[in-house]
């Protein structure tokens, strides 16, 4: 068991103990400090006097040393699984994964195996000092099970804290690409709404009135358009969009694009119809519309991630190419 300590100065007087420890010990997050204090791992040391402190709200006193014991991490509950991973970047602090479609990030009822966490536990065996006292990877964001692309994960407590701070401050550049039914008007802009659970279907999210949900901001730009809806309507049949997240709400891009009438091709939850509505004829037309109709997942890909490394200060930028199914659909749509 490791013991860490910090000496309180005059400017620290009156600060809550959990806040003081998290600010003076880099490896501790505020929530982790609070848990350790409540579990009796924090002590107040003044000369020969040592006293256990179990209240996170205890005000610190100048001249007193505060220590905290760091228990050994307990084994993770999810089982490690030897699942191949596409890893475009890894160092001692972080690992960046290009997640395939069909892989959930976290284990959950009905999906205890085959998740990204299971795969990372196997990949990082013996190299996870513990996040929150548990031997597990530090997941700070997630992408939907059937969305592909880039995800960054912390391997250590300090990196987890640093990444969490970056996401909280919106200092992460997250770019997605999407194939949509028809195209947005205007061709680029910002969607800013509140998002909450749908009152009609608790498994879905929905745009709600201001103040009734969580604030969500999506910036979008149309990169390509394909075909025409009908002979009488000149609007494109489909489009290839770039979307940049300023916030990270559940299903945010899917909900926002469906809200403006441009649902993702293949989206089984927010798409009203399978495939696309288009006019045309010939082999190229048939192939494009057939691929769109047969796509069994939302046409959404986390294409890139940019951030300042929380431990080294280096600029990190990782890209993932469009997966085969979406690349094939994009090529086919280009022939409309």
Each predicted region: which residue ranges?
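RNA pseudouridine synthases
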Residues: 1-202, 234, 321-336
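Short regulatory "switch" loops immediately downstream of catalytic or recognition motifs
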Residues: 40-49, 125-126, 222-230, 270-281
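Generic secondary-structure boundary signal with a strong preference for alpha-helix termini
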Residues: 75, 114, 161, 223-224, ...
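The conserved catalytic core of RNA pseudouridine synthases
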Residues: 133-165, 173, 196-262, 293, ...
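RNA substrate-recognition surfaces in RNA-acting enzymes
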Residues: 265-307
């Amino acid at each position: 068991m490791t013991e860490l300590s910090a000496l309180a100065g005059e400017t620290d007087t009156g600060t809550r103990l959990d806040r003081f420890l998290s600010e003076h010990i880099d490896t501790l997050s505020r929530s982790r400090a609070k848990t350790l204090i409540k579990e009796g791992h924090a002590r107040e040391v003044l000369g020969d006097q040592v006293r256990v402190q179990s209240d996170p709200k205890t005000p610190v006193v100048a001249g007193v040393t505060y220590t905290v014991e760091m228990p050994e991490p307990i084994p993770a509950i999810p089982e490690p699984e030897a699942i191949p991973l596409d890893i475009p970047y890894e160092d001692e602090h972080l690992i960046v994964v290009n997640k395939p479609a069909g892989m959930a990030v976290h284990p959950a009822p009905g999906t205890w195996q085959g998740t990204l966490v299971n795969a990372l536990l196997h990949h990082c065996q013996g190299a996870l000092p513990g996040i929150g006292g548990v031997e597990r990877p530090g997941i700070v964001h997630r992408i939907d099970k059937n969305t592909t692309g880039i995800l960054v994960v912390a391997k250590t407590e300090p990196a987890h804290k640093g990444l969490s701070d970056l996401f909280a401050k919106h200092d992460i550049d997250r770019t997605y690409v999407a194939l949509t039914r028809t195209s947005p008007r205007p061709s680029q802009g910002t969607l800013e709404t509140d998002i909450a659970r749908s009152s009609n279907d608790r498994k879905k999210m929905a745009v709600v009135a201001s103040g009734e949900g969580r604030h969500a901001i999506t910036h979008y730009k149309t990169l390509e358009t394909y075909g025409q809806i009908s002979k009488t309507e000149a609007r494109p049949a489909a489009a290839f969009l770039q979307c940049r997240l300023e916030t990270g709400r559940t299903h945010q891009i899917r909900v926002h694009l469906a809200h403006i009438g441009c649902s993702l091709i293949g989206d089984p939850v927010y798409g009203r119809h399978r495939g696309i509505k288009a006019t045309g004829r010939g082999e190229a037309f048939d192939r494009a519309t057939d691929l769109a109709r047969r796509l069994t997942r939302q046409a959404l890909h986390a294409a890139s991630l940019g951030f300042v490394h929380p431990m080294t200060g280096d600029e990190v930028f990782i890209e993932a190419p469009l997966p085969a199914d979406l690349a094939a659909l994009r090529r086919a749509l280009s022939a409309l």
